[in-house]
Design a protein with these regions (language model features):
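Hydrophobic anchor residue at the start of the ABC signature
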Residues: 137
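A short, proline-enriched helix->beta-strand linker immediately N-terminal to the Walker B motif
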Residues: 142-146
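Catalytic Walker B motif of ABC-type/P-loop ATPase nucleotide-binding domains
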Residues: 148-152
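Conserved H-loop
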Residues: 177-183
Length: 235
């Protein structure tokens, strides 16, 4: 397994994306920030859905993107598993067929691994929020990706379902051996799903650390706005 390294710059309208980030194998990093901070654009750049104006995206010694060298692998050439906020399952396919779309050989085993093997013949419309998430994650991992990217995976759920699914997803991500990035605007999601949190604002990462570190010593006004002021040792 290799470390993911991102150092990109890009202009999107009035937003200037300029950041560096590294994610180790088996580590989950949350990109936490307000809407419009550029979080999802970072995922798109990693996946090859957005070509930055400058910078690099490397996975170990493998160069997925390097503006100076003229390297820009297509999305199909990058080993990335993607899970979007609406889970994007094919509605006309069964659960098994959805996962087989990524890998026919791996589908039965990975459905069983994620606890939804008995739903193989079910249609997506009949699934609960947690079941849909498990199937989407199974499909993303069926192709044995080297990087896993999740874009607001819990935002479409109601409060009660969100709490239950968050706990399930945290357990699943703890077993994923590849670099993983989760985009979220919710500090609770970030705390439960990620090892480290990178707070973004205005296209830049303004502070990185565990949630307790960020809460204990916020270094940017956006960190304070999201997490509150530094906690006092006094009682």
């Amino acid at each position: 397994m290799d470390r993911l390294e991102i150092a990109i710059g890009h202009q999107l309208g009035d937003l200037t994306i300029d950041l560096e980030l590294g994610v180790d194998p088996g580590q989950t990093v949350a990109l936490l920030g307000p809407s419009g901070a550029g979080k999802s654009s970072v995922l798109r750049a990693i996946a090859g859905l957005l070509q930055p104006a400058r910078g690099q995206v490397h996975l170990g010694a493998h160069h997925w993107f390097d503006a100076a060298e003229g390297i820009n692998l297509s999305p199909d050439e990058r080993s990335v598993g993607l899970v979007f906020q609406d889970y994007a399952l094919f509605p006309h396919m069964t659960v098994l067929e959805n996962v087989e779309f990524a890998s026919a050989d791996a589908a039965p085993e990975i459905l069983s691994r994620f606890g939804v093997g008995e739903l193989a013949r079910a249609m997506p419309s009949s699934l609960s929020g947690g079941e849909r998430q498990r199937v989407a994650l199974a499909r993303a991992l069926a192709r044995d990706p080297d990087v896993l990217l999740l874009d607001e995976p819990l935002s479409a759920l109601d409060t009660i379902t969100r709490r239950e699914v968050r706990a399930e997803l945290a357990g699943l991500l703890a077993e994923v051996p590849v670099p993983t990035i989760v985009v979220t605007h919710d500090p609770v999601d970030a705390a439960d799903l990620a090892d480290n949190v990178a707070v973004m604002d205005g296209g830049k990462i303004v502070q990185v650390g565990t949630l307790s570190e960020l809460r204990g010593s916020p270094q940017h006004i956006t960190v304070e706005r999201i997490l509150g002021p530094a906690e006092s040792d006094e009682r």
